[in-house]
Amino acid sequence: TKVPAKWDETYDVVVVGSGLAGMSAAVEATAAGASCVIIEKMAIVGGNSNINAGAMAVTGTPMQQKKGIKDSPELLAEDMLREGLGLGDPAQVKLVAEKSLEAWEWTRKTLGVEWNEQTVVAEGGHSVARGCITLSGTGSTIIMKGIEKAKQQGAKVMTRTYVEDVIREEGGRVLGLKVRTGYKFPDASSGTVRYIRAAKAVVLAHG
């Protein structure tokens, strides 16, 4: 797609996808003072993150400590790589494991997510009990809290908006997106074409 003569909207950061990854990116971007839009092709936000069990594998939680469970980021990474049949990127897996407690605390303190702090569960494939569960037992709790936080901080949410193409300049730098608003799943030709410029970054966090 060619660079349009005119952009319809401009934001510092354009996030594609409103699941856990996209929501988190939007919260952090707006917290840093960036203008931000979240683009979601479906009529509701959250995607598959809404239907997970609201579980998070975390090492070093107060619940583990109370129960005397010995755990470590290294053991979590080992479990993840083994159960992923070695397909995971070791460096990325290591980062996820090392940041698990920090990420869990972020959902509590920044988003206000309520967790069952009386227990941890032994999820399949994990060597020890380290699964934290939301009080609601669903991932939608995290999504709703996160989207609410992002909007409070100035983020705009565009549902039923389909990304048709990523627009780049000749050198390859991403400039923005060609989207279709009013999109009717799964008809990729539906909706109205609009061009959204990203002044600083496009974050692809779609499924």
Segments the model singles out, each with a brief description of its role:
Residues 168-175, 192:
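A short, glycine/Asx- and small/polar-enriched loop/turn
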Residues 18, 60, 181, 206-207:
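Glycine-rich, N-terminal phosphate-binding loop of Rossmann-like dinucleotide-binding domains
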Residues 4-21, 37:
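Beta1/beta-strand and adjacent pyrophosphate-binding region of the FAD-binding site
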Residues 29:
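Aromatic pocket-lining residues of Rossmann-like dinucleotide-binding sites
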Residues 24:
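Short alpha-helical segment within the catalytic ATP-binding CA
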Residues 1-8, 35, 41-156, 160-165, ...:
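Conserved N-terminal/central alpha/beta ligand/cofactor-binding core
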Residues 8-11, 186-201:
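Core beta-strand elements of the Rossmann-like FAD/NAD(P) dinucleotide-binding domain
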Residues 42, 183, 199-201, 205-207:
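Glycine-/small-residue-rich beta->alpha transition segments that form the dinucleotide
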